[in-house]
């Protein structure tokens, strides 16, 4: 077998091993929600900013919103811990 081909095979195997190890660490890492906070005029609460959406998504308990074109800020904030 060619030395260069053998070296490429070793490097590929090492990359697969390190990638698999990194995935195992990611499974045990705590999940953090990455939603951005937004504020609408006249509201004191924080809302959830949805980027490039025309309306608030269903299933999150949103009851009101305001537009900050091209994004939308949805209320009430349905996730705790912020």
Curated annotation (Swiss-Prot):
Top-level taxon of origin: Eukaryota
Gene3D superfamilies with a match to the protein in the record: Anthopleurin-A
GO MF assignments: ion channel inhibitor activity; potassium channel regulator activity; toxin activity
InterPro entries on file: BDS_K_chnl_tox (IPR012414), Myo_ane_neurotoxin_sf (IPR023355)
Propeptide span(s): 20-31
Record's subcellular location: Secreted; Nematocyst
NAD among keywords: no
Keyword entries, A-Z: Cleavage on pair of basic residues, Disulfide bond, Hypotensive agent, Ion channel impairing toxin, Nematocyst, Neurotoxin, Potassium channel impairing toxin, Secreted, Signal, Toxin, Voltage-gated potassium channel impairing toxin
Tissue expression notes: Weakly expressed in the ectodermal tissue from the distal and proximal tentacles, body wall, and oral disk.
Signal peptide: 1-19
GO cellular component: extracellular region; nematocyst
GO biological process per UniProt: regulation of blood pressure
Pfam families reported in the protein's UniProt record: Defensin_4
Main location: secreted
Disulphide bond pairs: 38-73, 40-66, 56-74
Zinc found in the keyword field: no
Entry function: Blocks Kv3 voltage-gated potassium channels. Reduces blood pressure.
Family: Belongs to the sea anemone type 3 (BDS) potassium channel toxin family.
Name of the protein in its database record: Kappa-actitoxin-Avd4j
């Amino acid at each position: 077998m060619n030395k260069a081909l053998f070296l490429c095979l070793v490097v590929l195997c090492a990359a697969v091993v390190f990638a698999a190890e990194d995935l195992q660490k990611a499974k045990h890492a705590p999940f953090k929600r990455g939603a951005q906070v937004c504020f609408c005029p006249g509201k004191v609460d924080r809302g959830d900013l949805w980027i490039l959406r025309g309306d608030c998504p269903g299933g999150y308990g949103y009851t009101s919103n305001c537009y900050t074109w091209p994004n939308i800020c949805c209320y009430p904030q349905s996730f705790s811990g912020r």
